[in-house]
Regions:
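Membrane-anchoring alpha-helices and their flanking helix-loop junctions
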Residues: 1-80, 92-152
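Solvent-exposed interhelical
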Residues: 83
Length: 152
């Protein structure tokens, strides 16, 4: 299988988080946005972690691969548990972390990197995965895509 990217999604998330921080340090823009209360940031991070862990657990439960670069080894189609609410809970969890971080940084530029994360992951990770899953699981997967959102 030939995915458009070979960069692991957690690395993309980390790079975006790092760029978010750097952008606040080098920007001449003032911190014009209100900072998220620390409790809100923590809640979003816990929620994001839960999404990711539940997504991994659902894959492990049916013994299918969690490796985003080996989708051809996918043997089971998971549509229960957290996958009833999101087709990509692991990536949505990373997005929650970035929302928490951007809100905590209280600066407009980090939000651009959150948008870049969503666009990049959708184009270079999720869409290629979806093509493989549609090919492998056909009408069942297509029906699932009509019922469940890609992110949240």
């Amino acid at each position: 299988m030939n995915l458009e990217t070979k960069i692991p999604p957690p690395a993309i998330c980390f790079i975006c988080a790092l760029l978010m921080y750097i952008s606040t340090e080098v920007s001449a823009l003032a911190d014009i946005l209100p900072r998220f209360p620390i409790l809100l940031s923590v809640v979003l991070m816990v929620f994001g972690t839960a999404l990711g862990v539940l997504g991994v657990w659902a894959f492990r439960r049916v013994r299918t691969t969690v490796n985003p670069f080996n989708t051809e080894q996918t043997e089971h189609f998971v549509s229960d548990g957290v996958y009833r609410f999101s087709r990509n809970p692991m990536y949505a969890g990373m997005g929650c972390w970035l929302v928490a971080w951007a809100g905590y940084l209280a600066h407009p530029l980090p939000w651009l990197f959150l948008a870049a994360f969503v666009v990049y992951m959708t184009r270079f990770q999720i869409m290629p995965e979806e093509r493989v899953l549609a090919q492998k699981f056909g009408a069942e997967y297509e029906s699932y895509c009509r019922r469940v959102r890609r992110w949240l």
